[in-house]
Design a protein with these regions (language model features):
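Carbohydrate-binding surfaces of carbohydrate-active enzymes
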Residues: 1-52, 148
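Acidic-aromatic substrate-binding/catalytic surfaces of carbohydrate-active enzymes
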Residues: 3-4, 39-128
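Acidic (Asp/Glu-rich), glycine- and aromatic
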Residues: 3-5, 9-10, 55-57, 132-135, ...
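Short, surface-exposed linear segments at secondary-structure transitions and domain or protein termini
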Residues: 8-19, 60-63, 80-83, 142-149
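A short, surface-exposed interaction/processing loop segment used at functional sites
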Residues: 19-22, 65-75, 149-160
Length: 167
């Protein structure tokens, strides 16, 4: 049985950076953001199309090199729930954490911009059930690679149960 744990070499995670890909003698083609559709915010590049649903802010279409990477009807959504384990059931956590199964996300803002020759889409949500806010940021480079960042701010005075997962 171990009594202590020693750190031999501390682990430092590398920053997840998304850079544009450049061919040797070709200029970078900046993604184009089209905001003229009533239902979708569209980000297009030479070889990809990405659509965001304007009603809920979710990434709803991802096509690269003519191939659908998201099934029709599917959406990339934030998740705060996982299937409870036997130990969770024994502790009654499926009831205590139930508010996180559907925290009532309501889109309050969907913004887009071009920065550093990359498309940026930012969605802000109000989470009524847990009195918090959620911020999703999508950075899209010229090849159609997407970096998704999720940040949540909890209500300061609210007493909300823990969550199973954040992701």
């Amino acid at each position: 049985m171990a009594y202590d744990q020693l750190t031999i070499r501390p682990y430092t995670a590398k920053a997840l950076e998304l850079k544009n890909q450049k061919a040797s003698n070709l200029d970078i083609v900046v993604p184009v953001i089209k905001d003229n559709d009533h239902n979708y915010l569209i980000v297009e590049g030479e070889n990809f199309i990405i659509e965001f649903n304007k009603h809920n802010g979710y990434l709803s279409r991802y096509e690269a090199d003519g191939m659908q990477l998201l099934n029709p009807g599917a959406q990339l959504t934030p998740n705060f729930w996982r299937a409870p384990t036997d130990n969770d059931y024994g502790a009654g956590l499926q009831h205590r954490y139930a508010v996180w199964k559907n925290p009532g996300l309501k889109l309050t803002s969907l913004k887009q911009s071009i920065e550093n020759e990359q498309a940026i889409v930012q969605a802000e949500y109000e989470m009524k059930a847990v009195k918090g806010k959620l911020f999703l940021t999508y950075v899209i480079n010229n090849e159609g690679a997407v970096k998704v960042t999720q940040k949540m701010e909890a209500g300061k005075e609210e007493k909300v149960s823990d969550m199973f997962r954040f992701g």
